[in-house]
Amino acid sequence: MAKKVFKRLEKLFSKIQNDKVYGVEQGVGAVKSLASAKFDETVEVALRLGVDPRHADQMVRGAVVLPHGTGKKVRVAVFAKDIKQDEAKNAGADVVGGDDLAEEIKNGRIDFDMVIATPDMMAVVGKVGRILGPKGLMPNPKTGTVTMDIAKAVTNAKSGQVNFKVDKKGNIHAPIGKVSFPEEKIKENMLELVKTINRLKPNSAKGKYIRNAALSLTMSPSVSLDAQELMDIK
């Protein structure tokens, strides 16, 4: 098994130049050529930012609705009450509730990919924060998932909203589509993501903002991208 995996990776590495830095357009084409799995692999972009997340004013976090979606069917849970529950259901939310939903989560129910809540329900959400937080599901105003405009938030989530946040080392990883997408759609998704991240550059960040960038598939090696080209995207 290990030998078979090694041979597959060796074959993939032979298709790209390890020391080559690709422009956006060429990079998308190169990473698509690495598709080898028997399923529709996810295309992911990885960015190393010149920020220090230990400082609150250098935490880069946000959300973007990709123009062509991620190719993944997203299940959405909503914490709301009264008329806001109806708005959530009409917008297509998969799970809607309040205290009852919190109890279900405590009992192990995590069959959703994104959680949205109205501000007045955050005390209820807080009861399951230790469960949702580590899974990256905790609603946050910066990603538009704590809002009174429930219908818009659910629609965005279903349309391909991607939430992102730098990790402790200043990295952001985000899906930008499936390998089956046409190159142009993957490129447009990536440009929209990078444009949003560039807008969020902290004033206190010094030096080069995007230090390294790469594209990869679920089962492929990565392709290096021109970080300067990405920083120039406005």
Swiss-Prot record:
A Gene Ontology term for the protein's cellular component: cytosolic large ribosomal subunit
Claim: DNA damage is one of the keywords in the record: no
PROSITE patterns: RIBOSOMAL_L1 (PS01199)
An example Gene Ontology molecular-function term: rRNA binding
Keywords: Repressor, Ribonucleoprotein, Ribosomal protein, RNA-binding, rRNA-binding, Translation regulation, tRNA-binding
SUPFAM superfamilies reported for this sequence: Ribosomal protein L1
GO biological process entries: regulation of translation; translation
CDD domains tied to this protein: Ribosomal_L1
Pfam family, one: Ribosomal_L1
Superkingdom, taxonomy of origin: Bacteria
Quaternary structure note: Part of the 50S ribosomal subunit.
Record function comment: Binds directly to 23S rRNA. The L1 stalk is quite mobile in the ribosome, and is involved in E site tRNA release.
Similarity annotation: Belongs to the universal ribosomal protein uL1 family.
Name by which UniProt lists this protein: Large ribosomal subunit protein uL1
Gene designation: rplA
